[in-house]
């Protein structure tokens, strides 16, 4: 009995040491990420005129800046991430200088509350005004959120039960056109509607959000948990007309960032509603991602999970174009952030730990020299090696503000879980 007790005590002590070591490593990971982010975004803030919002780097090597005004093209869907990054730097450091910077660039984006040209008002407002309200609640921020949610409702159809992403979409080869496209990314914009309902209690915001989430669950998610990128609806009957892709490899493939949006989006829907089917769908999508045979060893995915595996594509795919297919750091960052929330809703401790471990592995890879830029490099963005769209030849192997945003958001979640 004494020997057993000694062995048990030694085992418990060893476990405590291991846990402490893991916790210390994760604390260093958080501090490293935010220290470098502060260095980069101090320089970014100094270099960026007020009212302009960094998105990526042009092929010429110059920082691509987008104005605050709503655009029909949807090119400014990323505008909220820059102020959101500044808000998270304030949240982590408590430094009021970051708060002042965040307030300035957030207020300059208020014009977006009237954006009705595309679905991404949710991304724009919740990454900026949503973070502002989270860290510094005020009637001003609340009113902008609620007003913007009203603008988003203008794109909802009772017939399809969904919010229309764009007014028109044509496939890369010009073979197919739809006037009611809904992409998996759109799920993320429900955050705005759910928040407006939470702030007002007005069900005009809740019902469209629930309807869109339910339709996405039914029509975008495959049996294996992967997500179709684009579902085309018949605007007169509400029926599904086609399932396609815009940014993925093929109609049948799983676009990596689209998969991240599915995991994150259904996790967010569960947060607001506690509907078990949303949790089940989020887990199904997460399991597809983290267990996929084509996920690289460092857990940073290629831009699509099925490159070269299907033939239903309409773009000029050249298997010899890249020595190695581009990775998408933004997909890993968004997935890591989603997993660190998802794990808190899972009853099975082993499953929750699996999600946490997967997230930490992604974050550790992103914080390595292979993905995190040195101070003053990378046009002052934090992470390297993201992809906007290979089929569109758009921003391939470039930095993106949304990669930095979700990386820092994930680090804050990890910090709160230490």
Model-flagged regions — what are they?
Residues 1-11:
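Bacterial N-terminal signal peptides that target proteins for export
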Residues 20-21:
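C-terminal motif of bacterial Sec signal peptides marking the signal peptidase cleavage site
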């Amino acid at each position: 009995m004494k020997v057993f007790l000694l062995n048990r005590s030694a085992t418990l002590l060893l476990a405590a040491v291991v846990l402490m070591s893991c916790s210390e490593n994760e604390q260093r990971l958080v501090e490293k990420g935010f220290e470098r982010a502060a260095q980069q975004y101090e320089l970014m803030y100094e270099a960026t005129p007020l009212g302009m919002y960094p998105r990526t780097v042009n092929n010429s090597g110059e920082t691509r800046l987008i104005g605050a005004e709503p655009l029909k093209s949807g090119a400014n869907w990323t505008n909220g991430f820059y102020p959101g990054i500044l808000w998270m730097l304030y949240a982590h450091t408590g430094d009021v200088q970051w708060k002042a910077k965040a307030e300035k660039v957030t207020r300059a984006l208020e014009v977006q509350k009237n954006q009705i040209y595309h679905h991404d008002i949710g991304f724009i407002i919740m990454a900026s005004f949503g973070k502002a309200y989270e860290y510094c609640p005020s009637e001003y921020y609340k009113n902008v959120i609620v007003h913007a949610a009203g603008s988003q409702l203008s794109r909802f159809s009772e017939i399809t039960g969904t919010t229309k992403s764009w007014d028109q979409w044509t496939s890369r080869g010009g073979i197919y056109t739809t006037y009611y496209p809904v992409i998996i990314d759109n799920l993320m914009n429900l955050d705005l509607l759910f928040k407006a309902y939470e702030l007002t209690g007005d069900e005009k915001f809740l019902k469209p959000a629930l309807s869109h989430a339910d339709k996405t669950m039914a029509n975008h998610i495959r049996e294996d948990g992967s997500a179709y990128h684009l579902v085309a609806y018949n605007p007169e009957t509400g029926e599904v007309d086609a399932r396609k892709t815009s940014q993925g490899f093929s109609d049948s493939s799983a676009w990596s960032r689209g998969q991240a949006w599915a995991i994150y989006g259904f996790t967010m829907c569960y947060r607001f509603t506690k509907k078990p089917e949303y949790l089940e769908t989020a887990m199904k999508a997460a399991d597809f991602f983290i267990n996929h045979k084509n996920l690289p060893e460092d857990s940073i995915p290629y831009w699509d999970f099925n490159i070269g595996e299907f033939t239903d594509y309409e773009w000029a795919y050249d298997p010899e174009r890249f020595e190695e297919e581009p990775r998408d750091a933004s997909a890993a960052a968004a997935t890591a952030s989603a997993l660190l929330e998802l794990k808190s809703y899972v009853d099975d401790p082993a499953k929750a730990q699996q999600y946490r471990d997967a997230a930490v592995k992604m974050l550790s890879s992103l914080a390595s020299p292979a993905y995190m830029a040195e101070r003053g490099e990378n046009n002052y963005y934090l992470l390297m090696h993201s992809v906007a769209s290979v089929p569109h030849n758009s921003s391939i192997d470039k930095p993106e503000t949304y990669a930095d945003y979700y990386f820092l958001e994930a680090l804050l979640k990890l910090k709160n879980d230490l």
